[in-house]
Amino acid sequence: MNFLWIPVTIAAAFFQNLRSSLQRHLKGKLSDMGATYVRFAFAWPFAVIWLAVLVLGFNLDLPQPNLAFVGWVIAGSVTQIIFTFLLIWLFSFSNFAVGTTLSKTEVLQVALLEAILLKEAVTPLAAGAIIVSSIGVLALSAGKERLTVGGMFRGLGQKSTLIGLACGFFLGASSVLFRGAALSLNHDSLLTSAAFTLVLATLLQTILVTIWLVTFEKGQISSVVANWRIAATVGFAGWIASICWFTAFTLTNAAYVRALGQ
């Protein structure tokens, strides 16, 4: 196994946390979908520049998309939009502690989805490590929020809890789907496959969320433009996080990547 995915995943997790921290500053200035839009629209130009550097600067061939790739990208893009919206929505609840804690079950869901969709099962040893790490992350998260086991079970019926579980599912699904997209290109350069997948994904996401905002939330585009400085910072941090995630997904199982990324 190529262990390059380990430092790449650590970088992805760092910049994802940075992006999320920056994105919270937009919460009071934009709607939930407006803040979601920023992540994709302002990351896309950076994704295009990076792909151009790889293709033109290093003389690498541009991947040739196929129908399977298109299907993976569409599914991955939509699930990631849903995840981002749900995560931002979750922070608007005063009692989101249980929800954010249970969203950490994402890695277990990734392992299951990867086995179903990509026919890639983790080894028994890795499965044990994933379960132990997930329990550890849940315990740490619950301790941070001062949650008891009983409190978590009592909160299972709350809307914020269900949103948290849904966050874990859609984040896990997008990870698996984007791995499927990059691998379906069958390209010699994993870096180029990851970069090409990210360009197409963020473009599609930008188009879809733009249509939503223009149709249902008129005025949000203007608000985004008014906050372009912080939006551009969010987009840059988000691009680095995304290209690191996508690259790691091409190097090894998404379950391993998400387990380390927690």
Q: What is the meaning of each model-derived region?
A:
Residues 40-44, 104-108, 130-133, 137, ...:
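Residue-level recognition of pore/gate-forming positions within transmembrane alpha-helices
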Residues 170-174:
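Conserved extracellular-gate-facing transmembrane-helix segments in secondary transporters
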Residues 87-128:
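Membrane-interface helix-loop-helix junctions at boundaries between adjacent transmembrane segments
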Residues 47, 112-115, 124-145:
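Hydrophobic transmembrane alpha-helices of multi-pass small-molecule transport proteins
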Residues 35-36, 99, 197, 257:
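Juxtamembrane helix-start motifs in multi-pass secondary transporters
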Residues 110-114, 118, 178, 182, ...:
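Small-residue (Gly/Pro/Ala) motifs that create kinks and tight helix-helix packing interfaces
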Residues 251-262:
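Short alpha-helical packing/oligomerization segments
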